[in-house]
């Protein structure tokens, strides 16, 4: 049983990252946003694709050219005060660039391919050997670290999640439309749950928490209580 990893899974916008950051601070763990690795990988591949866009991006990522490029990518996560992750892509700080609606739309084409998931999972396991981590994602407790001692599954309605995402983007100075965000969230949920490889679902031994009906502080208190048991 892995006691150095706490897994928080759930759909996009369910409050995982906000909760995970605060819990990490309270228990002395580092917070790791696993989705940032997929976003950084998507950004890298999308930029490479744009240099010669002969096919649709979703088709291009299946090519040997795209897959071979994995050997050239270097993604680094720097932990900082406040449990913010600074994401460096080949030395460039892309912490904001990976959060744009454009990357959000394209990430599903990366997340549903085994070769890209294996690349990210290898990076996550390397970090877990060096740090005590609380991770949020889609398949942390089901595939990446099925041996994690503590697993939680956070969920919320698509409307509530869209509002959270809208406010987050607004704070970052990124313009977005609430209705479009909700549509993208619904499509992302469908893609995550129905994909062949590592679909989104609640692990049998994960504790379900509905963040629609609980405040952020209530969710944090509930998780801390379980961790103390």
Curated annotation (Swiss-Prot):
GO terms for biological process: nucleobase-containing small molecule interconversion; pyrimidine nucleotide metabolic process. Its EC number is 2.7.4.25. The keyword Cytoplasm applies. It catalyses: CMP + ATP = CDP + ADP; dCMP + ATP = dCDP + ADP. Keywords: ATP-binding, Cytoplasm, Kinase, Nucleotide-binding, Transferase. It comes from the Bacteria. The keyword Nucleotide-binding applies. It is found in: Cytoplasm. Gene3D superfamilies: P-loop containing nucleotide triphosphate hydrolases (3.40.50.300). One of its GO terms (cellular component) is cytosol. InterPro entries: Cytidylate_kin, Cytidylate_kinase_dom, P-loop_NTPase. One of its GO terms (molecular function) is dCMP kinase activity. ATP binds at residues 10-18. Belongs to the cytidylate kinase family. Type 1 subfamily. HAMAP family: Cytidyl_kinase_type1. This is Cytidylate kinase. It comes from Leptospira interrogans serogroup Icterohaemorrhagiae serovar Lai (strain 56601). The gene is cmk.
